[in-house]
Amino acid sequence: MFGLSKEVISEIEKKAAHFNKIYKNCLKVKNEDVLIISDYGTSISQLPLMMTTGYVLAAKDKGLPVNVVFQGVKKGFMQADDHITEAIKRLEKKSIIILALSNKLGRFGEEKSFRTYCQDKGHRFLSSTGLGDVKNDYFDLFLEAMNVNYRRLQKRGLAVKRLWDKASSITVKTDAGTDVTFDVEGMQAISNTGEYGEEGCGGNMPCGEVYIPPKGLTGVEGQVVIDASMKVDQGAQLVEEPLTLTIQDGKVVKMEGKHAKLLEATLRKYEDRAEYPLRVRHVAELGVGINPGAVVIGSMIMDEKVLGTGHIAIGSNSWFGGAIKTIFHGDQVFKSPKYYVDGKKMSV
């Protein structure tokens, strides 16, 4: 199937329960049409094909009508292939779309965004992007992050969300040197815990984070030491040496460390293409990982969900309630954070 060996398919079949669990517990499927959008992987990763195979086998097991479409790997500012856009637009309302992609879907035709389109049409969706960063050997680890107790995960996420929704400020500290404060007065947190059963809902898989935008453009001050993984134009990668970001008036003004040049090159690339380049370096998000089944592997779809990590994002946040609209969004992950909500230490 899809060019995978019999041995690989056999291993995927052994994990069928994991994929069935997603259809049942997260998407709450009945008899909807399922569209899976994928690509053929990269030189180091066949994970998009492996995930696609798992979802296809589980859909067939449930008797769901399933269609799979492939496109080339999309990077930077590339558009989704025309036949992909057409396949999405042919779907009946209130269908299910699953993305299993090496990097990203690509810009979605003339629509505002894939997420907005799904909301308008009542489609439920799962998004597993950036899989090209994940070696085949990590397939089992990836599935373990999906095979969690979703009731417990949702309970944990809701507790954090309720606390953050009431907060005026959140400070994060780490022994590595992070000490940053977010003004979040009046902002609403998002709990991404796999509750994708309602019309127009969807999100990441694996899931398991709570995140919040800062108030306005200038509501972040301090220093963040990135010591787990980072997102740059080439994709996500593990951090070999800590990367220190200095933030003033909500904006990254200084970067220090081995990987500073790489992040700087990424930000400059997007500034050169952005309609409003001054927005690209703004800090857009504070997040906390709450998934006990996830581990840091150098793939942002997983790393930002790991229990015992925190993250910030640089760039856009307009789609989740923030004031920054731009063409870049890059998460940066750090280990062992301590969160203080209005001065009081928070338990995760």
Segments from the language model and where they lie:
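Short polybasic amphipathic segments
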Residues: S169-V172, L243-T246, V253-M255, G310, ...
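Short, glycine/acidic-enriched capping/hinge loops at junctions between secondary-structure elements
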Residues: Q46-M50, G298, A323-I324
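Intrinsically disordered terminal and processing segments
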Residues: T309-V348
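Dual-mode signal for accessory low-complexity, basic/Gly-rich regions
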Residues: L238, K254-I314
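Oxyanion-binding "anion nests"
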Residues: P213-E264
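A broadly conserved detector of short glycine/acidic/proline-rich loop/turn motifs that flank catalytic sites
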Residues: Y40, A176, G186, A228-M230, ...
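Active-site bordering "gate/hinge" segments
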Residues: M1-Q223, K231-V232, L238, K338-V348
